From Swiss-Prot:
This is Gamma-glutamyl phosphate reductase. It is found in: Cytoplasm. Keywords: Amino-acid biosynthesis, Cytoplasm, NADP, Oxidoreductase, Proline biosynthesis. GO terms for cellular component: cytoplasm. Its main location: cytoplasm. Gene3D superfamilies: Aldehyde Dehydrogenase, Chain A, domain 1, Aldehyde Dehydrogenase, Chain A, domain 2. It comes from the Bacteria. Pathway: Amino-acid biosynthesis; L-proline biosynthesis; L-glutamate 5-semialdehyde from L-glutamate: step 2/2. Disulfide bonds: none annotated. Catalyzes the NADPH-dependent reduction of L-glutamate 5-phosphate into L-glutamate 5-semialdehyde and phosphate. The product spontaneously undergoes cyclization to form 1-pyrroline-5-carboxylate. Belongs to the gamma-glutamyl phosphate reductase family. It catalyses: L-glutamate 5-semialdehyde + phosphate + NADP(+) = L-glutamyl 5-phosphate + NADPH + H(+). It comes from Neisseria gonorrhoeae (strain ATCC 700825 / FA 1090). The keyword Metal-binding does not apply.
Amino acid sequence: MSNTQKQLALAKAAKKSVNTADAEEKNRALLAMADSLEAAAEDILAANRLDLKAAAGKIPDSMTDRLLLDGKRICAMADGIRAVAALPDPVGEILETSTLPNGLEIVKKRVAMGVIGIIYESRPNVTSDAAALALKSGSAVVLRSGKDAFQSARAIVAALKTGLAQTRIDPEAVQLIEDTGREGSYEMMRAKDYLDLLIPRGGAGLIRAVVENAVVPVIETGTGIVHIYIDKDADWDKALRIVYNAKTGRPSVCNSMEVLLVHEGIAADFLPKLERLLVRGRIEAGLPPVRFRLDPQAARYIGGEAAGADDFDTEFLDYILAVKTVASVEEAVGHIEARGTHHSDGIVTENRHAADYFTTHIDSAAVYINASTRFTDGGEFGLGCEMGISTQKLHARGPMGLKELTSYKYIVQGTGQVRE
């Protein structure tokens, strides 16, 4: 048995301590984890410095921001765990009840998933978020961090286990796979005897590898090639504010805008205003400017590189924005449906017909009217922290909170009935 299999077995053995715990016991465990995380801040920051040193010069600045931890972010991680503790416990919720003509009483009841596996890349906060959500939803969790964030993840898990050791929940219910190589991931993908669910969080390559190779049930958290369409009837003040936030708020995350579509009837006047905001305005403020990848029409109005063949299919996760002009809302929708990833897409318009057409025909997990796509987030949606953004339709779609990490079963109460 490999080390990875041993860790999977430990998680499976420990799941009973989680799925038999009541809400009060789980909440005590989460609060102890949060306190322990803050108490271990110096150890976690020291580990994070090792990750940052190893990554120096190898990843862009926007990706370094995803990897970076500081005291404020550790406090935010701890507060995220406390927020999960404050949420209602989904386990045991009665979803439906019915009584059949023969007197059988049927109850549909929400239950824990069992053991949840998470394969993720260079975001240390995923470690604590995933552990908190899994435990509150009644499941053990097996974490496999990317190499970039492994030292940080190891220190975070050590702190979480220290907190759990003070409660009745077995600390082995949280496992961090030590093998950060490809084999560690593939063992998890094949671990159908141990894992009830596997969730990948990361770039397109990671997600594709998991979806194509896993024999464990997978919830796909797709990449975010996020679009915003500025309609000819848009309020320009709203549009500029929304685009600025959606692109520059935190470009390294999956709900950040990557493609801007602008109605050709306003492009000549709107795009220069946008350029002043995203390029000159940010340079004057000492901030990184946005770099444009432009289709031929957009290139007539603002400066930037000519868009390459793949620029409208790329999740840049950087201060880069692909810009294209379109003749109508119908053309915008056609482009998004052909090139998007069904994550989050938005329209800015004061035209109700255009908004209704857009929301009806865009088949994405979150569709926005006159708002930044940066709101696609478990915390912003009132779910607490999230396990990821699902872009598939089966079981879960959009931000995955506690309810999305559970299943259900039927309890059938009889008085001796038999089927004739």
